[in-house]
Amino acid sequence: MSALPPTALALAEQLIARASVTPEDAGCQALVVQRLQAQGFDCHTLESGPDDFRVTNLWAVRRGRSADGFTLVFAGHTDVVPTGPLERWTSDPFVPSHRDGRLYGRGAADMKTSIACMVVAIEEFVAAYPRHAGSIALLLTSDEEGPALDGTTQVVRWLQARGERLDGCIVGEPTSVNAVGDMIKNGRRGSLSGRLVVQGVQGHIAYPHLAKNPIHAVAPALAELVQVVWDGGNEHFPPTSWQVSNLHAGTGASNVIPGEAVVDFNFRFSTESTPETLQQRLAAVLDRHGLQYTIDWTLGGRPFLTRPGSLTEALGSAILQVTGRTTELSTTGGTSDGRFIATVCPQVVECGPVNASIHQIDEHVAVAEIEPLKEIYRSTLERLVA
């Protein structure tokens, strides 16, 4: 077995230096595989997707001595969002840079630092507990920031086919608000999107009696939908939200009544609602307004919730030990790959660095919070797997 590894900071810098914009992995997972194989991990690289959007996935596992031991999975993504205008960055987004006690680079917060902390925590844990009772696994994908069709969801199907048992999973999403460990996510709302196409009759704007304006037709329905209380939420989730993201209509000419209007919208829904009930209720409003329409629905993910149990207790205790903070359980924010893992794993929790700069110009993490995050992951391993 190799000697103790370099710091999580050094590994984070190596990962940031790889320009892995979705769906590219740019060698990030190969670097991780090299390190984990040295620790006795069985590594499987799984590629999927069409030729013009090839996704790289990784499943790595180190079995424990006990068949009944706790299997803890660390999950993350090696892909990052595009940089945006390079001229607005203070330094090259794919050259890790240090300023004011911060590590800068695309993926620094979301989520290459988390991956580095996971890997080094695993290495240190295996060195200290080479005959650990439970099992340790790592799941990585290069398709989380994109359509997420060929990433974690494909690995989950593969795991199901193999009959793998997972007991708990920590997703390294940047969940912290002001300081590392102050908030973790024990669930996420569901996401249901729709594209509504309302049919009208195109015509000259001076002869409205010979046309049918779809904008005028849909406007009262939209006004009603904005006012609907879809549910009241519950102790774990805020009320379901319905938001319009895009409106499209018109030919660009100022004297033409359009023939159709397109409305893109999204539900972020709690466990008090289902995709089916939301679809039915929205259609009822549209029908009541007498619209001629079609809707294409896309279910991004159903809500999931991990109630307090062995994983939240171990992670919360680790955070308290390392930082002195009592963490807050939350389900706010967007979706993550936790929604896919939750279909095969009874306990899924997200824990990572401060999220204030994610997806932004000059993305960064505080260097002083990298080692504590690694220690949180290692302490959780000790509590569940040793």
Curated annotation (Swiss-Prot):
Transmembrane segments: none annotated. GO terms for biological process: diaminopimelate biosynthetic process; L-arginine biosynthetic process; lysine biosynthetic process via diaminopimelate. Coiled coil: none annotated. Binds 2 Zn(2+) or Co(2+) ions per subunit. The keyword Cell inner membrane does not apply. Its EC number is 3.5.1.18. It catalyses: N-succinyl-(2S,6S)-2,6-diaminopimelate + H2O = (2S,6S)-2,6-diaminopimelate + succinate. The active site is at D79, E144. It is an enzyme of class 3 (hydrolase). Pathway: Amino-acid biosynthesis; L-lysine biosynthesis via DAP pathway; LL-2,6-diaminopimelate from (S)-tetrahydrodipicolinate (succinylase route): step 3/3. Zn(2+) 2 binds at D110, E145, H359. GO terms for molecular function: acetylornithine deacetylase activity; cobalt ion binding; succinyl-diaminopimelate desuccinylase activity; zinc ion binding. Keywords: Amino-acid biosynthesis, Cobalt, Diaminopimelate biosynthesis, Hydrolase, Lysine biosynthesis, Metal-binding, Zinc. Its cofactor is Zn(2+); Co(2+). PANTHER family: ACETYLORNITHINE DEACETYLASE, N-ACETYL-L-CITRULLINE DEACETYLASE. Belongs to the peptidase M20A family. DapE subfamily. Homodimer. This is Succinyl-diaminopimelate desuccinylase. It comes from Methylibium petroleiphilum (strain ATCC BAA-1232 / LMG 22953 / PM1). The gene is dapE.
